[in-house]
Amino acid sequence: MPESIIAGIPVHFPFEPYEVQRAFMEKVIICLRDGTNGVLESPTGTGKTLSLLCSSLAWIRTRQSEQQKQIRKLQDAANNTKVGPTGIVPGEAAELALTVGKANNWGVPKVIYASRTHSQLTQAMRELKRSAYAGMRSVVLGSRDQLCIHPEVMREQGNSNKVNMCKMRVHSKTCSFQLRVESKKDHPDFRGPSIMDIEDLVKVGQKLKMCPYFASKELVNDADITFMPYNYLLDPMARKANKIELSNTIVILDEAHNIEKICEESASVQIKSSDVAVAIEDVTHIMRIFTSADSQDFSGDEPKDFTLDDLTLLKEMLLELEKAIDGVVVDNLAEGTTYPASYMYELLAKANFTYGNCASIVALLDKLVQYLMVASQNNSSMIMRKGGSFLVLAELLTIVFANKEDIMAKVHRSFKVHVEVEEAKQNAGKPAPKQQQQGGWLGKGNNTSNSSSSNKAKVINFWCFNPGFGMEQLLNTQVRSVILTSGTLAPLKPLIAELAIPVAQHLENPHIVDQSQVYVKIIGTGPDRQQLISNFKNRDNPKYISSLGQTILNVSRIVPDGLLVFFPSYPMLNKCVDAWQTSGLWADIAAKKPIFLEPRGKDQFTTTMEEFYQAIRDSKGACFMAVCRGKVSEGLDFADRNGRAVIITGLPYPPLKDPKVILKRRYLEANRTKENQLLTGQEWYNLDATRAVNQAIGRVIRHRHDYGAILLCDSRFQDNSQVQQLSKWIRGHLGARPQCSPFGPIVRELRQFFRHAEETMEQPKERTDEPLLKNVYKTEAVTQENNEEKPLFKVKREPGQMATNAAAFKQANEMAIKVEMTNSIKSWTPDDYVSAAGRTQSHSQSKPPNAMDFMSRLDSNVSSIDFNSTGTGNLVKIHKRERSSPTFGDTKSSSQLKKRYKLVDNIKTEPSTSSSCKAPESRADFLREVRCFINQDEFRDFGKALLAYKNGGDEAFESLMSLLFKLLGKPQMRYLLLGIRRYLKNEHKAEFDKRVAT
C-alpha cells in the first residue's frame, strides 16, 4: 500500500490519501505525539474511520519500532560485564532497565476505539481488515447478550437476567464454557487471527466450546487496539465490571455527536418506589431462607459472605428509605416536582446511606444478588428472584456517591432531583401481591387525582446536566489522549465548553466530493403552493400533510433507486401515513417505489433493512420512511443506489415541555458566561434538532464517487440561525443567503441533476453484501428447522423487460423462507392493505404454505409476485392486477393458474372441505382474496381485529372468531376461514378446530 509521511510518521493508506484525509490524520498524529486532546469533524464519506485507524496505528507501530531498538541496545549493554571507572557494572544496570521496561510495557500506549453501537464497531473492524495494519492485534468487547453461548443463559429474557444468570454459574463453577477458557485461550484458532469481531468470537467459541465473553478479555492485554461501546468507557460501573485499564491509553470516541447526552446519562440515575419495595421483599426472603433448614440445600457448609446482622441492618435502612420517599411531596402530579441536588443526599442520609458506608453496602448488594441466583437455581420450588432491585440500588449509590464531597458546590450546580408519580403496572387476572395488600409501594398504583402525593409511589430522578462530569472521570484515569470525532460535531466551541476538556487540536473538514455531485435545496412550498413547515401549529393541518405527500410523490418519480424520508418524530410519521392511506397518496407513492417503514423492534429492524436493500435492486428502487434520531439515521450506510436522495420533512426539536428539556435549558442559562462560551438555552434547543438533521443527511454521499440530493422540506431551514448550525459542507451548497426555491424549478433541476450524474459519474457495481447486515441466506439452499429447501424457480432477465427483475424475485423467495420466531405475530403494515386493495405494482413471490408465513411476516413491506405469466423460460412477470368483481369464479381461475407450479412435497396443507379451492399461501394474495368477498368497512374491521389479536389474549381471540364467522361463514368462503387457521397462535388452534367442526 502507498506510504505517506504525515507529521513525521510513515502512514500506509490503501490509496493515495486525499487532502482532507491527510489533514485529518495529521491532527490525530499530533494529538498522540504531544499527548493532547482533539475534536475533529469530517463529513461522512470522507474516509474518517479509515483515517483514524491508519494514523493512530501507524504512530503506535512507530513507537513499537523505537522501543525494539531500545531493547536491543539494553540487551547488548547487559551482555557487557566490564566494570566502569565508577565501579558500576553496566550490564547489571542495563538488565535492570530491561526488566523495568518490560514490566511497564515499554510505555507504548494502546488504542481504545469506542463508538455508539456494535454495528458501528463492526464497520470499523471491517475497515481495519482491509488496511495495512490488519496484522496488528485487536479485540472487541461485547456484552453477554451478544457473546454468551450457554443455552440456559441465552433463554433468559432481558440483558440483566442474562448477566445475573451468568454470574451465578461462574460463581458456582457450573458453566463448562467459562471453565474451558483457561485451557483453550492459547489455542491457534483463538490466538491465530489478528482481528476477530463479535461474529468471529462466537464461531470460535462454539468450535472450541469456550466462552467467547470471558475469552475476549484474555486478548485485551496483548491487543494494540480494543474496540468497545461508549458505555464501557463512560459508565463507571461498566468500566469497573470490565476491568478496563485506561492509564497511558489513547481513547478515540467515534460518532461522538451525541457525546454530551451520553456523558450526562452516564452520570444520571433513577430509582422507583417499587424498586425499594421489591428490595425489602427480597431481603426478607433471604432472611427467611437464611435461617431455615432449607438453606443447607444450597449453601452447604461453606462460610457465607454476609451475616444475619448484615441483612437486618440493610432491611432497616431500606424501610427508612421507603419512609423517606413516602414523605416526598410532589406538588404537580402531572409534570412532577424539581428539587436541588442536595435533596438526594438528604433523602439517602435519612436512611443512613452515606459516603462512609456506600462501598460496603454496594458490595453487600452484589453478594445478595449472587446468593439469590444460587438459591433459585438449587431450589426449583422457590419463586425465581434475581435481585434486580439490588442492582438498581447499587447503581444509585455508585453514581450518587461517585461525586466527591469536595466538589459539592459543582454538583449542586450541575444536578437536579426530579420527582414524578410512578405509574402502576396492571396485572390483570392476578391476585395483588402481599406488599400491595399491605399498602406498600407495590400497591400504590391507584393514582387518582384527588389523593395526596404522599400516598403515591414515586420515581426519583437524579439528573446530570453537565457532560463535563463524565469526561472529567475519564481524564482522571490518566489517559494519554482523547480524540472526539464525527461527521456532525459543529459548532465546536460550545461542544468543547460543555465537555470542559483541554483541546489542543480541532478541525472542520470540507467534504471530499465535488459540487456537481450534490444537489441541496430548501423546499418551502409543495406542488400546490402550500407552505411546508412542520411546526406545532401546522403539523395537524390536513393541507400541509397532503402537500408534503405530494412533494414526496413528485420526488419519487425523479429520484432513481433509494429514497430516504426522515420525519421529526414517530407520531408525525404515523399521522402522515394514516392521512396518505386515506387519501390514496400512499398507494400512489408505493406504485412508484415500494415503501418501507422504520420499525422499533430489533428483530423487525434487521429484517426490514435486508428487504429494503434487496428491493433497491429492482428497477424502481424503494422508499424508506424513518425518524430523525432513530436507528436508520444513526450509522447505517445508504451508499450509492441504496440512497440517492434524502428528504428532511421537519426539524426534530425535543419535546418543549419535557422536564429534562426544561431543566437543561435552565442549567445553561444559569451557568453561561462570556468565558465558558456555553450556548443559551434556546441555542441548545435549536442545535439539538439541527444535529439530528445533520446526522440523517449523512446517510447519503458515503464516498468519493457517490452522488445524491438533499431536500430540506421545511421553510424554517432558510432562517440564518438554522443554516449556521448545518454542517459546514452543506452550508457551502446553500450559498451565503439561502432561500426557499419554487417547486417547479426544483423538479426540473433535480431531473437534470440525476440525468447528468448518471451520464458522467461512475456507476457502482452490483453489491454482493449489504452494509452492516449479515447475509442470512444461501444461494443454493436455506436451512430452516433442520429442513433444507432449494429455490423453487429459476428466473432469467431479458433486456428491455423492466418489470422482470431477478434480484427482486430472489428477494421475495428468500425473505419468505427466512423466519426468525416460530410463533411470532407482527404488525400489519400499510402496504398490506394497499396490496389487498390491488393498488400496488410490486409483488413478492408466493411460496409453499408455512405455518409462519402470513402473520409472522406482517411487518414486511414486500408485496407478493403472482405467477400468472404464460410465457416461456420460467419468466416471472410483475404486473398490476385490476380489481375484479367479487365472484367465486374469478378466484377459482386464479387458483387454477397457480397450479402450473409444482410445490415441494413435504409441505402440509390445512384441511379443506373443497378439493378445488384452497386459501392462497401468500399473505398479500390471501388479503386480496378476502377483500374480494367483503366490503370496505368489513375489511377495515377485519384488519382491526387482527391487529388486536396480535398483542391480545383469549379475549382478543374471541372477538376475532366472532368476526371471522360473521364475515367468512358462508359456504363459498369456508376455504378462507379454514385457511386462516395456520396463522393463529398455537394455543388457540384446537379451539378453532372445534368451532369449525360444529
From Swiss-Prot:
**Entry function:** A probable ATP-dependent DNA helicase implicated in DNA repair and the maintenance of genomic stability. Acts as an anti-recombinase to counteract toxic recombination and limit crossover during meiosis. Regulates meiotic recombination and crossover homeostasis by physically dissociating strand invasion events and thereby promotes noncrossover repair by meiotic synthesis dependent strand annealing (SDSA) as well as disassembly of D loop recombination intermediates.
What is catalysed by this protein?
Answer: ATP + H2O = ADP + phosphate + H(+)
Gene3D superfamilies to which the protein is assigned, alphabetical: 1.20.1160.20, P-loop containing nucleotide triphosphate hydrolases (3.40.50.300)
UniProt domain Helicase ATP-binding: residue ranges: 7-324
Q: What is the designated name of this protein?
A: Regulator of telomere elongation helicase 1 homolog
Name the Pfam families on file. ARCH_RTEL1, DEAD_2, Helicase_C_2
| GO BP annotations, alphabetical order | DNA recombination; DNA repair; DNA replication; male germ-line stem cell population maintenance; negative regulation of DNA recombination; negative regulation of t-circle formation; regulation of double-strand break repair via homologous recombination; telomeric loop disassembly
Q: What class of enzyme is it?
A: isomerase
Enumerate the GO terms in the molecular function aspect: 4 iron, 4 sulfur cluster binding; ATP binding; ATP hydrolysis activity; chromatin binding; DNA binding; DNA helicase activity; DNA polymerase binding; metal ion binding
Q: What is its EC number?
A: 5.6.2.-
Q: Which GO terms describe its cellular component?
A: nucleus
Where does the record place the modification Phosphothreonine?
A: 887
Q: Which NCBIfam families match?
A: rad3
Taxonomic superkingdom: Eukaryota
